[in-house]
Design a protein with these regions (language model features):
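Aromatic-glycine-rich donor-binding/catalytic loop that engages nucleotide-sugar donors
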Residues: 127-131
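Residues that recognize and position ribonucleotide moieties
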Residues: 27, 78, 117
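NAD(P)-dependent short-chain dehydrogenase/reductase
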Residues: 1-27
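A short, mixed-charge helix-start or loop-turn motif at secondary-structure junctions
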Residues: 19-20, 103-106
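Active-site loop of classical SDR/Rossmann-like NAD(P)-dependent oxidoreductases
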Residues: 60, 108-120
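Residue-level signal for the nucleotide or nucleotide-sugar donor/cofactor binding architecture
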Residues: 29-32, 58, 133
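Mid/C-terminal beta-alpha module of Rossmann-like enzyme folds, strongest
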Residues: 37-104, 121, 135-146
Length: 148
């Protein structure tokens, strides 16, 4: 089920109440905004080109706040700094080594949560008759589905 994996777990966690947010940013895209360009590309003469599919780059604080608002929940208000995340990473590895719990943090994951890398998904819009869905509408739809 969607709410048990991937982005769905994030929605479920925010619905339960999320107090912390990573300090980095993330590129987001709706599922339909991945599928529709793929179909358009298969029907086009475009060959051997790569496309980045990102509708918007958002700070985690803003993204999690928008999702929380659409779920009628309080937005997270405490930053998860790089130092705090690395402390959690070390604790995670210790608990894993002791056999107490399964590991969930990696150095790469910590770095990605703190990264402010921006992605440009505009190439697909220039090459095809395509435009990304409004992020706000997509998040509201997902939140409505979750509440149902």
């Amino acid at each position: 089920h969607f709410w048990e994996r991937s982005s769905g777990t994030l929605i479920r966690r925010i619905a339960k109440g999320l107090r912390f947010y990573p300090i980095g940013s993330v590129g987001i895209v709706a599922l339909e905004d991945v599928v529709n360009p793929l179909i358009l590309l298969m029907e086009s003469n475009i060959k051997n080109e790569r496309f980045i599919l990102v509708s918007e780059n958002l700070k985690y604080k803003d993204l999690l706040g928008k999702i929380a608002k659409s779920l009628d929940k309080k937005p997270p208000k405490f930053p998860l700094t790089k130092g705090l995340l690395y402390t959690l990473y070390v604790l995670d590895k210790i608990l894993y080594a002791l056999g107490i719990k399964k590991s969930f943090l990696s150095q790469a994951f910590v770095q990605s949560l703190c990264s402010d890398q921006k992605y440009d998904g505009s190439k697909i819009e220039k090459k095809l008759a395509f435009s990304y869905q409004d992020t706000k509408i997509t998040l509201e739809k997902i939140s409505k589905d979750y509440k149902a």
